[in-house]
Amino acid sequence: MTRISRSAYAEIYGPTVVGGVGDRVRLADTLLLAEVEKDHTIFGEEVKFGGGKVIRDGMGQSQRLATDCVDTVITNALIIDAVTGIVKADIGIKDGLISGIGKAGNPDTQPGVTIIIGASTEVVAGEGLIVTAGAIDTHIHFICPQQIEEALATGTTTMIGGGTGPATGSLATTSTSGPWHMAAMLQALDTFPVNVGLFGKGSSSSHGALLEQVRAGAMGLKIHEDWASTPASIDTCLNVAEETDIQVAIHSDTLNESGFVEDTFAAFKGRTIHSFHTEGAGGGHAPDIIRAAGMPNVLPASTNPTMPFTRNTIDEHLDMVMVCHHLDPSIAEDLAFAESRIRRETIAAEDILHDLGAFSIMSSDSQAMGRVGEIVLRTWQTAHKMKLQRGPLQGDSERSDNERIKRYIAKYTINPAVAHGIAHLVGSVEVGKLADLVLWKPAFFGVKVNMVLKSGMAVSASIGDMGASISTPQPVQIRPMWGSHGKALRTSVAFVSQVSLSNPAVSELGLNKRLEAVRGCRGVTKHDMVRNNWLPAISVDPQTYQVYADGQLLRCEALAELPMAQRYFLF
């Protein structure tokens, strides 16, 4: 029997499991170590493409017709996923969907084949690469279209939010107001290779004014204090949501003008709602909106500028608040409004509540107190900070951090998908879902993508000089690929409400994107948030702003230095 050393095997085929012990992979330059839990491939029967390799006719490639074979296979990849786990496998893609996670090859010559390779199969070499589900950003201000290229370059494949461009309302609030703007933005977003969904303006006590936006194609409604986040508007908005099975997102009343946090909670009446930037620096009842993270009907999210807590976090927030919410620093009341939202104690507690699974979702708040290209990066910086300050999570050890890794990746993949009724199509690396997949070199994990697949077709990738003789010479840049051009845009989805699908005005928009209705939004609770469903009793001292969870004070220090930072961005 021919033998190969473990290190040599990993170099050729990627990490594996031997004798029940998995190889480990460091994520970027963090302290986080992922250990392979299972290897679906078979030793000695691995498939690999290239000169003198296995995927050749009569060897690893069968003579089967296209109907029996996958369109694309990713070979020997390390999957990191909140649902599937941390596993080594071949991934089959057929008709834009993940069709298999297992062992690829030729069943006529190899044992255990579950993914058939044929003449109609393209190969993506996954050896030594990490594969994750595309990130889902549920807090997008659609201010400028260039955000989408930035998002794709950092692994985001689904963008949900609102706006109409750099209008003053859109600079502050994530809502696309009214049927006319809804139609225009759906048509504008039709030319980009990402899944999209739009929020209508939910700040109204008029049932009809909200319903007409849902019928026009809104996949959800957004309540925002700048338009009014009153108990009446909250109740009306949730009534419409219950009737139409859509999600409601809320940015509550920082100034406590129309009531305190208890009044907002009472207006929920136990109904499901997605709470944006639940810590409060991004907006919400001062100083105690963070209490929402302990409610079973609230799906609590963070936006990325407060994550993780560093020595620069407090200083940068004041200017962000002033600009985003159209405030005047020469007006004392405006300055007091901004300062009321920025609290060192609640920002520090936010890191810990994420680590313990009380906060369930991460998002960006793009160009409106958040960075569209940093949702993935800041999630892992936070996980690193928490390991550094708090040690291993329960179930982890000094050897590996699988439980923490699966908890944190859920925050920008499966949990936002579940919250907004789109988990039947996106959010995890599972059979039957869209092949919206991101490939990473481990050293660049969470920072710079190797390749982004949209329904199995490359839409963004790190590619060298296009005038060179090969694809690798410098400058290597993340560039748009064929999947982002022409009618290949049909590989993306526009998520809308179910009631809008029967509206002739929506079907007459002539969209290339496939229209898919959100579903199951109203039955979701905090218990459905994968690996992030802790429900502590949270309290905030009104004088000191100190945060307690189940009676325990939550405190951590600001970091002065982070991984995944300057060493990756010299150019």
Swiss-Prot record:
Family annotation (InterPro entries): Amidohydro-rel, Metal-dep_hydrolase_composite, Metal_Hydrolase, Urease_alpha_N_dom, Urease_alpha_subunit, Urease_AS, Urease_asu, Urease_asu_c
Cofactor: Ni cation
Domain Urease positions: 134-571
PANTHER family named in the record: UREASE (PTHR43440:SF1)
Superkingdom of this protein's organism: Bacteria
Residues at which Ni(2+) 2 binds: 222, 251, 277
Name under which the protein is recorded: Urease subunit alpha
Family matches, as CDD domains: Urease_alpha
N6-carboxylysine, modified sites: 222
Pfam families reported for this sequence: Amidohydro_1, Urease_alpha
KW Metal-binding (keyword) present: yes
Family per record: Belongs to the metallo-dependent hydrolases superfamily. Urease alpha subunit family.
Example GO biological process: urea catabolic process
Keywords from the named record: Cytoplasm, Hydrolase, Metal-binding, Nickel
GO terms for cellular component: cytoplasm
Keyword Metal-binding carried by entry: yes
GO molecular function, one term: urease activity
Residue positions of the active site: 325 (proton donor)
Quaternary context: Heterotrimer of UreA (gamma), UreB (beta) and UreC (alpha) subunits. Three heterotrimers associate to form the active enzyme.
